[in-house]
Amino acid sequence: MATPTQDIFPLLDLEELVICLQSCDFAMATEEHIARPTSQYVITLYKQIIENFMGISPEQVLAEQLSSRQNTEGNDESTSVDMFDGPYRETLQMLTLNKICYKFFENVGINDFNIVDLYKPEAYRTRRLLSAVVNYARFREERMFDCNQFIIQMEEMLDELKSKFDDFNYLKAQLTAIEDDDEKTPGELEDLLQKNKVLETNLKKLTILQEKLSIDYNNYKMKKQELLRELEKNSFTLIELESKKERLMNYNDDDQDLQNSLNNSIDRLTEEKKKQIGYVSKLEGNVSNLKVTVDTLEKAIEHIYDILRLLSTDLQESHRAELNIEGIKGPLTEKRTRLKNLLESNVIYKYDVLKEQLNVAETEYQRINEEHYRETLENKKLIQELEGKYNNIIHNKMQEAEVYIENEITEKKIKILQSELNDIQIQFNNEIDNIELHYSTLVGHINNYMKKLITALNNH
């Protein structure tokens, strides 16, 4: 038990304590109840205190835990309801209240609060605990105006935190959608790459064919020019021959042989001219067909280039999408790690608090055992002293009135002393049994709670 000199707050007397508590809207605070506290009274008063200063209650915490278990366990909902509504409900409420009170009183300057302060409250400890509450209320009232700025900042940070959680959920949904699309993308990407390879092969073939046709077309143009020059030359020759023919027609008929020879030459040249004209027409038809083929090939090549551009655009978009996915995965993974670390640290903190409370309870139990052992030794010593005194009295009185002492006084005193000793022993044994019963019940509930908590953590 801590002494007043170890506390950071003053120990108030009952009258001042009651006035301060009633000014804080705790109407049930009276001198009589605080001077002789009962378990039911301090439990009700502490519930009002933590609900007023912390804004929570054991029932609310249990309801939230029940709702959380129903959401996470699914089919095991009936088991959770039985655990919270069954015979353990009152015990869970007391453990929850003890945990909340331990944290609250630790914050206001008391580090040795334990469950005994709820089940078997002492007047001095109750007065000390309530003095800490009054000191905290005074400090809170004095510093409330200084905390307005921090309250505003806290609200802004809470709003920002909610916004971040909304952004996180949105990014998580986007990541899920992208991952779903990403599972389908590899197959489509492979198909596009395969089609792209086929189109590239066809494009190479068409490019080679285009080059070959271009060479043939250039050769054709050169040959056409040569034929046109030859045709022009033959035309000039024909014109000259026609001119000569006209001049020769003026000669007399004696030159019939020469005329026949000239006519034959003219016919031969005319026939050759017709052949050249037919060949030129055929070449022009081939050129027209070749132009149509070249135009068709150019259109096909342009179409293939358009397809390649589209494929390149799709590949670039897929690459950008993959980069965006990688960029989003990094922050999301980091946020997930931070949230996981935060949850693990919170669970470890709760486990440490329970472990600390268990250590305090074990220390209190050891102290009670030591007091019991010490009181037992004192009782044995007292019995031995009484027996010694009794023996001395009997020895002295036996010399004076042995028959009277044996029949009357000795039996009467022995019965009275034996009755008193039996009453003291029975009362002491009852107190020890009650303490051991409460301690074993507490340890059992704590073990069950820790097992269920560990099971819940493993399930998560």
UniProtKB/Swiss-Prot annotation:
Keywords: Cell cycle, Cell division, Centromere, Chromosome, Coiled coil, Kinetochore, Mitosis, Nucleus. InterPro entries: Kinetochore_Nuf2_N (IPR005549), Nuf2_N_sf (IPR038275). Gene3D superfamilies: Ncd80 complex, Nuf2 subunit. Acts as a component of the essential kinetochore-associated NDC80 complex, which is required for chromosome segregation and spindle checkpoint activity. The gene is NUF2. Pfam families: Nuf2. Component of the NDC80 complex, which consists of NDC80, NUF2, SPC24 and SPC25. Belongs to the NUF2 family. It is found in: Nucleus; Chromosome, Centromere, Kinetochore. GO terms for molecular function: microtubule binding. GO terms for biological process: cell division; chromosome segregation. It comes from Candida glabrata (strain ATCC 2001 / BCRC 20586 / JCM 3761 / NBRC 0622 / NRRL Y-65 / CBS 138) (Yeast). This is Probable kinetochore protein NUF2. The lineage of its organism: Eukaryota, Fungi, Dikarya, Ascomycota, Saccharomycotina. Residues 155-304, 349-437 form a coiled coil. Its main location: nucleus. The keyword Cell cycle applies. One of its GO terms (cellular component) is Ndc80 complex.
